[in-house]
From Swiss-Prot:
This is Large ribosomal subunit protein bL20. One of its GO terms (cellular component) is ribonucleoprotein complex. InterPro entries: Ribosomal_bL20 (IPR005813), RIBOSOMAL_L20_CS (IPR049946), Ribosomal_protein_bL20_C (IPR035566). One of its GO terms (molecular function) is rRNA binding. Belongs to the bacterial ribosomal protein bL20 family. It comes from Bdellovibrio bacteriovorus (strain ATCC 15356 / DSM 50701 / NCIMB 9529 / HD100). The lineage of its organism: Bacteria, Pseudomonadati, Bdellovibrionota, Bdellovibrionia, Bdellovibrionales. The keyword Hydrolase does not apply. Keywords: Ribonucleoprotein, Ribosomal protein, RNA-binding, rRNA-binding. Binds directly to 23S ribosomal RNA and is necessary for the in vitro assembly process of the 50S ribosomal subunit. It is not involved in the protein synthesizing functions of that subunit. GO terms for biological process: ribosomal large subunit assembly; translation. PROSITE patterns: RIBOSOMAL_L20. The gene is rplT. It holds the Pfam family Ribosomal_L20.
Amino acid sequence: MARVKSGKTNRARHKKVLKRAKGYYSAGSRAYIHAVEKNDRGMAFAYRDRKVNKRNFRTLWNQRINAAARLNGTTYSRLIGGLIKAGIQVDRKILADLAINDAAAFTALCKHALA
């Protein structure tokens, strides 16, 4: 039986890893061993930062809602508490968007929440 070597398989695997490693500094984009490590770290950072991104956006929305609420004579916590008591279910993303793009609607929500 003929000896089976893995040249074709290895070449394909190396090409795939080096293609993903484009743009990395120095040997990180040229040497297979370094490219594997860079790819692993890059994927770990990407996984972590997908979670962090959600946190950052929620913080940004809360800050925007608080700033708009203070323009309407209340605070973020009083506004959110009032909305919950009034039974108005609007998520923070929509509230922040209203605060920036439709101040009249946000003011109306504030009045309902504080009534």
